Design a protein with these regions (language model features):
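Elongated, mostly alpha-helical coiled-coil "stalk/stator" tethers of large membrane protein machines
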Residues: 1-150
Length: 150
């Protein structure tokens, strides 16, 4: 990971933590990351398009997001660093998980787990790790049975 990604991601996280909106920004940045295609990010650094036009595109596309995230994306666009936005958001997530002591896990099973099974698994993992746990569930029909935790 490059220094730009670390610095900008850390700056965004520190601001969010100080202003008590880290949870809200985490939720919104995840949604934004899903929308950012490679083509869109390259458009945001295209020198043949004026900076003001690129920034207006960001304002139009993301007018409903938290002002800190919108301003962050505008700043990155202004500085020609728009392609670093997803990496900066990744750094934000890493710092969030470190600060709030959340462990990420992936549970892969042959069949979808019921809500009750998910709840029991999350409780057991939290008890064993002593931390909050965020589990991503994946179904892999090639598994014969059981579950794999990563």
């Amino acid at each position: 990971m490059n220094e730009i990604v670390r610095e900008y991601g850390a700056g965004l996280f520190e601001l969010a933590a100080e202003e008590n909106c880290a949870d809200e920004l985490l939720t919104e940045e995840r949604e934004i990351k899903k929308l950012l295609s490679r083509e869109y990010l390259h458009f945001l650094i295209d020198p043949s398009v004026s900076k003001e036009e690129r920034k207006n595109c960001v304002r139009q596309a993301f007018s409903g997001v938290h002002p800190y995230l919108l301003n962050f994306m505008l700043l990155m666009t202004e500085r020609g660093l728009a392609t670093e936005i997803p990496g900066s958001f990744g750094e934000y997530e890493k710092l969030y998980y470190d600060r709030y002591e959340i462990v990420k896990a992936t549970a892969t099973s042959a069949f979808p787990l019921t809500d009750e099974q998910k709840k029991r698994l999350e409780e057991k993992l939290a008890k064993n790790t002593g931390h909050r746990v965020e589990v991503q569930y994946v179904v892999d029909k090639t598994l014969i049975g059981g579950m794999r935790l990563d």
